[in-house]
């Protein structure tokens, strides 16, 4: 006689899950349409002009809700080819700043320019084309290794794919697979987290965009794998402007500029040595990490 009760309880749980999913779906459908940008004729990299990667933040302000700013007045000038690290506690605004740079959200005030061109004056797709991303949460879709790496770059050659894999130290592993570069992968493939991140780095290298976003790319792997990934990162960042978001401060000592954020504001900036010498928030954060490691 308990079976009907169990079935009723199971049905009730399913209804609860459906209600939660429906709320998210309808919330998405009710979002306002994005602005029509078909009238924007300016393009980054148009007329054969290569995008160098100079980035200028000028008095940027942003809040997810009106009247509740989380980034109050952010300004920074980044030269082409520089490596910029953004550090700070959880909720400081690090990832939000990168999302604004790529125009995933519109800023409330100020401006963001790439090579002197305000990103608001060009279509979003054109802004997105200037970036490659390597995220902590890597993804692999069902397809061959070759297809996974070439995903972001239509028309890429086999040689470019293999050269990228050699540069990140993944070529030997791929050739040990049953079908090499033609081995079919999916989310359940027996790739380690580190191998997935190396594949993502190879994908970004093939894309060859002038600006890189490296978000928490080494925070979930062991020390040896982190070293391999760091070498691949170093190869990837050569000649490109890069923004690195990391909690492991040991990985960004060589950054040209470190922006220390807290509560949406840049409270310190400088090189690793300059910030340590200043003995401020960054120095406390850095020393606390190594005290925990000891």
Explain the meaning of each model-derived region.
Residues 1-28:
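Cytosolic ends of transmembrane helices, especially the final helix of ABC transmembrane type-1 domains
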Residues 13, 20, 30, 241, ...:
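Alpha-helical coiled-coil oligomerization motifs
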Residues 14-17, 31-34, 61-66:
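An intracellular "coupling" helix at the cytosolic face of ABC transporter transmembrane type-1 domains
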Residues 27, 34, 150:
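Conserved E/DxxT/N motif and adjacent residues on the DHp alpha2 helix
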Residues 37-38, 42-294:
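ABC-type nucleotide-binding domain
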